[in-house]
Amino acid sequence: VKIPNVVITGANGYIGKVLADKLPDAKRYDINNWDIKSPRGIILPTVTCVVHLAALVRVGESVRDPLKYYSTNVGGTINVMRAFPNAKMVFASTGAAFHPDSPYGHSKVMCEQIIKDTCKEYTIFRFYNVGGGSPTNPEGLPLGIEKAKKTGTFTVYGDDYDTKDGTCVRDYIHVDDITDALVRAVREPAAMTDYEPLGSGRSHTVKEYLETYQEKYGKQFDIVYGDRRPGDLPVSEVPFVSEFMTPKKTLEDIV
């Protein structure tokens, strides 16, 4: 299958680096220091596909500074569409868009609607909790575990949710599985659906994630239970697994 002329926004990020390595035959556009928030009059009508990954993604930060998230995520998406007017859009949304309870989630829902109203071809992916190692990021661990490796203490935000152990439930998906789905979306016709959930279909609590990590590596952290974080969803599970997705990795592979 011929690879289209591809632009990846956020190509220097965790997911973007892995995706770029999986598209070796794609024609690359090296657009140096382009900030999606500040368009410089770039218009490239020959680009046939944009994988739009660039965004701000911290739920707590979005609650503290919502305008930052709306200007970057929504305004930036509009700028991307103006820069590549003829491109198929492959958009990275979020599982939080199912029940948005933060400016981050709301910003992604807005982007989804703008894309549907504007783009002739689009595939909207709702990402769940991406993790796992890759050549560009050998560990790919959540910030909480990265911090715990240094301090010996892991903070769980909220232990009184209506879940089996009181902690949040998440669908963890490996970065390799996510980027395989993105490659398919680049190569194949646009889905033109409301959304395509990119998750494993297997849910785990935050505590289960932590226990799996500790068991795999023989580490023990002191667990501190903090207050719930504003904007955190108690449960984030996929309603179905997208046909673009063939999950191969387990939670043990991700940690």
Language-model segments: what does each one mean?
Residues 50, 64-89, 109, 113-114:
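NAD(P)-cofactor binding segment of oxidoreductase domains
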Residues 103, 113-180, 184, 212-214:
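NAD(P)-dependent short-chain dehydrogenase/reductase
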Residues 6-23:
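N-terminal Rossmann NAD(P)H-binding glycine-rich loop of SDR-like oxidoreductase domains
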Residues 26-42:
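Adenosine-cofactor binding site in Rossmann-like domains, unifying the SAM/SAH pocket
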Residues 40-72, 96:
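NAD(P)H-binding glycine-rich loop region in Rossmannoid oxidoreductase-like domains
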Residues 42, 175, 208, 225-249:
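Conserved C-terminal active-site "lid" loop/helix of NAD(P)H-dependent oxidoreductases
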Residues 159-161, 193-197, 204-211, 218-235:
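C-terminal "lid/loop" region of Rossmann-like NAD(P)-dependent oxidoreductases
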Residues 52, 78-105, 122-125:
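Conserved Rossmann-fold NAD(P)-dependent oxidoreductase catalytic core, especially the SDR/UDP-sugar
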